[in-house]
Amino acid sequence: HYFFLADVTIPEQMEGHTVRAVLNTGATDIWNTDNPQIMAYVNGRFAATLDMNHQFIILSEHAKAGETYELAFYAYSSAYAGTFTGTNFFRLELAVYREEAAGLYYDMQAVYEAADLLPEDNLSRIEGFKALERCVNLLDLRRPGSAECFESMKMAAQELEGTYYADRRPNPVTVHSIGHTHIDVAWKWPLRQTRQKAVRSFETVLNLMDRYPEYRFMSSQPQLYEFVKEDAPGVFARIRERIKEGRWEAEGAMWLEPDCNISSGESLIRHIIYGR
């Protein structure tokens, strides 16, 4: 368990932009239980949860130069004496978020990942990579961060939209993406960390719902809700509001994910009865 404090001040060049505090711990393996799990506070307020998949805090959508933020971090790692490799670190940086860059990145990533899964002679694969090539050829990366660079990103995004995405929108297929987090109640960390992980994960979901009104989420295992109700009643109250809005689905069908090798038949039946 570690605590970190940092006071950060918005520099003049970030005036008016969306500014994030970006954290890097060196963690890259999602299954590595040494990966730090972090609760982040901004000016004394519980603001975000961080891990290897969530690595930034939004400080301001319209930053003001000279404005100072007090950041506090409570970090946990399951590493213990004799096994910790010393590869984890704690580095904090301020960064400007630019929609031109982020939007283009994800639009290109979607095309690349879809095309890469198809056979080499597949027409959709060929069209996808050709669209990406046209897109990349429009980018002016001679001076990263310059006005010309961001303008070229807009042009590339328009090219990808007009010559690739627009042609595929008439497809009658509709896909609904529903968020979910799988939390093992008895995993490779102590139960108290499972309780904190539930709070961290649900706080992340609530923050995403604040940023994206269309976001929907489903989570099962009523025992997790019991933990959050006991440990973070404020978070639990916000979850209830999202459930009322129809944006958060609290699901069963079992009280928690059981171990079917050890549990008796009666135990499994009780899981289902109380879970539903």
Residue ranges: model-predicted function:
Residues H1-R276:
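Carbohydrate-active enzymes and regulators
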